[in-house]
């Protein structure tokens, strides 16, 4: 028996979807998994025969009873995901579907894909879901997979040495103002430092920082401030279901987080004293201004006690190992 994992390539280097899949794959390879590379491309350029040959090439090294971690979606359309899944089935392998996102739940216009998505999920031997809330939601649409693991948190592997921290009364947010409208509507006195290459007019208390490499970003954020996890109103329901990737970056940087109430990771933040949970964006200034130096440093200490789990990839290591055990276990 050998273990494999699919991996997305061909997106922009800033693509969170690709960064997340590449990160999981790097950890998997360190555990002895082999990579099944999947390139992003317009699938309509393939004839049915060409598509079949392409999928044969991806799967050519597989043997019966191998285990494949299938990271979904591939972002090559649901049709591609279905075809790849069923090609894997032909090879007689055990399939663990690792859900990063559920396209029908992300965008209202794609909800028509829900039945098809659930149908191929239900053929998996094991399912990894971002949260229990996501499991419950998918079960309400017909999910019947018995073996389910919950991810809980994105890792953010890094060897960057953390800087001495100061209680800076500012908030960090790596993100595109075109994607997150709350940035353009920022009306509170606390400075929001946005890391982006997009040029546009922003409110006076929004400080535009240049896009930075992961190492530069972690080092800069580790000097102090708060990491913000926030979604626009239209995305709040989905935020309660999935794991935001940037949360792991803040934890890796060793700074307190400010998150929106209802986020899927809320219990981890609360139980480990990693930051603050708020209901409305106006609450940010009150937290930043009222938190004392002593209180801030206490939370920083708790974050930096916890963050080796994220910085060294232990959430993903455990998840992948548990997935193999679950795939082979008869119960």
From Swiss-Prot:
As for what it does, the entry says: Required for polymorphic O-glycosylation of the serine-rich repeat protein Srr2. Catalyzes the second step in glycosylation of the serine-rich repeat protein in this bacteria. Transfers glucose from UDP-glucose to the terminal GlcNAc moiety of 3-O-(N-acetyl-alpha-D-glucosaminyl)-L-seryl-[protein] which results from the first glycosylation step of Srr2; does not use other sugar nucleotides as substrates. Complements deletion of the gtf3 gene from S.parasanguinis strain FW213.
Pathway field of the UniProt record reads:
Protein modification; protein glycosylation
Which enzyme class? transferase
What EC identifiers does the entry list? 2.4.1.-
Q: Origin, by domain of life? A: Bacteria
> Which SUPFAM superfamilies does the UniProt record give?
UDP-Glycosyltransferase/glycogen phosphorylase
Q: Where is this region: Substrate protein-binding loop?
A: 106-111
Q: What is known of its domains?
A: Dimerizes via the C-terminus; dimerization is required for tetramer formation. Binds protein substrate via an exposed loop in the N-terminus.
- Tell me which InterPro entries the record gives: Gtf3
Keyword entries, A-Z = Glycosyltransferase, Nucleotide-binding, Transferase
Q: Where does UDP bind?
A: 16, 179, 211-214, 242-246
Could you say what a knockout of this gene produces? Altered modification (probably glycosylation) of Srr2.
Query: What GO biological process terms does the UniProt entry carry, in alphabetical order?
Result: protein glycosylation
Protein family per UniProt:
Belongs to the Gtf3 glucosyltransferase family.
Annotated Gene Ontology MF terms? nucleotide binding; UDP-glucosyltransferase activity
Q: How does it assemble?
A: Homotetramer; a dimer of dimers.
Name the species this protein comes from. Streptococcus agalactiae serotype III (strain COH1)
Show the coiled coil region(s).
Answer: none
What protein name is recorded for this chain?
A: Glucosyltransferase 3
| Key word Lipoprotein present | no
């Amino acid at each position: 028996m050998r273990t494999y994992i699919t991996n997305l390539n061909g997106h922009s280097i800033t693509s969170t979807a690709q960064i997340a899949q590449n990160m999981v794959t790097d950890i998997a390879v360190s555990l002895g998994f082999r990579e099944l590379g999947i390139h992003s491309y317009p699938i309509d350029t393939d004839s049915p025969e060409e598509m079949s040959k392409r999928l044969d090439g991806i799967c050519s090294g597989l043997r019966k009873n191998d285990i494949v971690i299938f990271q979904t979606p591939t972002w090559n359309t649901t049709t591609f995901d279905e075809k790849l899944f069923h090609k894997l089935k032909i090879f007689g392998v055990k399939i663990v579907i690792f859900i990063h996102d559920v396209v029908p739940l992300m965008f209202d216009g794609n909800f028509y894909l829900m039945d098809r998505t659930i149908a191929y999920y239900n053929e998996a031997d094991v399912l990894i879901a971002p949260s229990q809330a996501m499991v419950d939601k998918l079960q309400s649409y017909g999910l019947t997979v018995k073996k389910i693991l919950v991810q809980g948190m994105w890792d953010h592997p890094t060897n960057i040495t953390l800087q001495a921290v100061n209680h800076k009364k500012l908030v960090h947010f790596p993100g595109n103002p075109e994607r997150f409208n709350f940035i353009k509507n920022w009306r509170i006195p606390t400075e929001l430092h946005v890391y982006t290459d997009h040029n546009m007019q922003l409110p006076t208390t929004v400080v535009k920082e240049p896009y930075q490499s992961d190492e530069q970003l972690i080092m800069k954020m580790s000097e102090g401030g708060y990491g913000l996890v926030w979604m626009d109103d239209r995305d709040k329901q989905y935020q309660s279901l999935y794991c935001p990737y940037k949360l792991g970056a803040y934890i890796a940087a060793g700074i307190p987080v400010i998150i929106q109430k209802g986020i899927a990771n809320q219990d981890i933040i609360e139980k480990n004293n990693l930051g603050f949970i708020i209901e409305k964006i106006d609450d940010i200034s009150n937290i930043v201004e009222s938190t004392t130096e002593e209180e801030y440093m206490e939370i920083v200490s708790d974050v930096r006690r916890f963050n080796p789990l994220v910085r060294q990839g232990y959430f993903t290591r455990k998840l992948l190992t548990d997935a193999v055990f679950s795939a082979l276990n008869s119960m």
